[in-house]
Amino acid sequence: MSVVDVIGLLATAAYVTLASAYKVVQFINVSSVTDVAGLESDALPLTPRVDVIVPTFNENSSTLLECVASICAQDYRGPITIVVVDDGSTNKTSFHAVCDKYASDERFIFVELDQNKGKRAAQMEAIRRTDGDLILNVDSDTVIDKDVVTKLASSMRAPNVGGVMGQLVAKNRERSWLTRLIDMEYWLACNEERIAQSRFGSVMCCCGPCAMYRRSAITPLLAEYEHQTFLGRPSNFGEDRHLTILMLKAGFRTGYVPGAVARTLVPDGLAPYLRQQLRWARSTYRDTALALRIKKNLSKYITFEICAQNLGTALLLVMTMISLSLTTSGSQTPVIILGVVVGMSIIRCCSVALIAKDFRFLYFIVHSALNVLILTPLKLYALLTIRDSRWLSRESS
């Protein structure tokens, strides 16, 4: 047995041990969750003022109109202001359609930026023009259930809760094999990862399609948020993760509200999906460094999770590279590694299907192949090109 074989088998053993420990600890924390945001208090009025921000850039008209209509249909009893910000679109048809339809609605503020400055700049412009107690960001390709504002606002009554997010669902789930996988990705990210993090008041990313923030918490952070840099360069993506980390750094809690459902359009082709994943991976690496610097504000579980996720990716990459290098050598190591990965994937898919009581998760085994062959190498590329701040999906639209 060669040195490469030994390294491959050791990496595999370490991966199995780490992944198993992580999932067991995560399951224990998910099962222990009783309050996903914070303790009830009278810090906010029963119906605080809510400002809903909808940044839009070259959005499809029907998609944007559907998004705005879902906000107008909220059952929330308090005052709502809706700010639609056109981020310098080259095609303003959808923005003008919304302006025309809601021109006489006093709840609306319409903002038109003279050039494309990015989602963060659009958010900042809306924040400066409003003064509500709570700020809800809704992506322009997202539709929210009618009780989302009510449920998110209710979860933020404790003064130490700075931000919360709702449950994300792929609106176009039935479009393709990929959208079905992404919908399952979202379910797992929300109902395993986020809900376990929420037990400790430390959801690490209040996802952009549907995230609510407390204005009094966010205001002192806006300068740092707006002018984020990484290695001396402006950082113009991953705004949701960065703002969440800044909230945690300032000592606020962040939470996940599974009953507040937001249905968002997801990539239905592999190329746009991979561009999105590349952007997200770079953002995650950038803010992981910041998160580890504020570990004193985080629970031991959150620190363990951050380390386990990154180390797990590294081990899986080593396993993949060694398997490929030994493919033609006659070694049994690639077979062992493949067997372990397939076996763990089957166990995971079956357990999730049983827990969720939804047997479509058996199909998620396809994602394991996608993860090993494409997403894990993509994460390595993201790390090697971490200084690249291009949005990618906009440039390709």
Swiss-Prot record:
<comment type="function">
    <text>Involved in the synthesis of Nod factor, a sulfated N-acyl-beta-1,4-tetrasaccharide of N-acetylglucosamine which initiates a series of events in the host plant species leading eventually to nodulation.</text>
</comment>
<protein>
    <recommendedName>
        <fullName>N-acetylglucosaminyltransferase</fullName>
        <ecNumber>2.4.1.-</ecNumber>
    </recommendedName>
</protein>
<comment type="similarity">
    <text>Belongs to the NodC/HAS family.</text>
</comment>
<dbReference type="GO" id="GO:0085029">
    <property type="term" value="P:extracellular matrix assembly"/>
</dbReference>
<dbReference type="GO" id="GO:0005886">
    <property type="term" value="C:plasma membrane"/>
</dbReference>
<keyword id="KW-0536">Nodulation</keyword>
<dbReference type="Pfam" id="PF00535">
    <property type="entry name" value="Glycos_transf_2"/>
</dbReference>
<keyword id="KW-0808">Transferase</keyword>
<keyword id="KW-0328">Glycosyltransferase</keyword>
<dbReference type="GO" id="GO:0030213">
    <property type="term" value="P:hyaluronan biosynthetic process"/>
</dbReference>
<keyword id="KW-1003">Cell membrane</keyword>
<dbReference type="InterPro" id="IPR029044">
    <property type="entry name" value="Nucleotide-diphossugar_trans"/>
</dbReference>
<keyword id="KW-0472">Membrane</keyword>
<dbReference type="GO" id="GO:0050501">
    <property type="term" value="F:hyaluronan synthase activity"/>
</dbReference>
<dbReference type="InterPro" id="IPR001173">
    <property type="entry name" value="Glyco_trans_2-like"/>
</dbReference>
<dbReference type="InterPro" id="IPR026463">
    <property type="entry name" value="Chitooligosach_Synthase_NodC"/>
</dbReference>
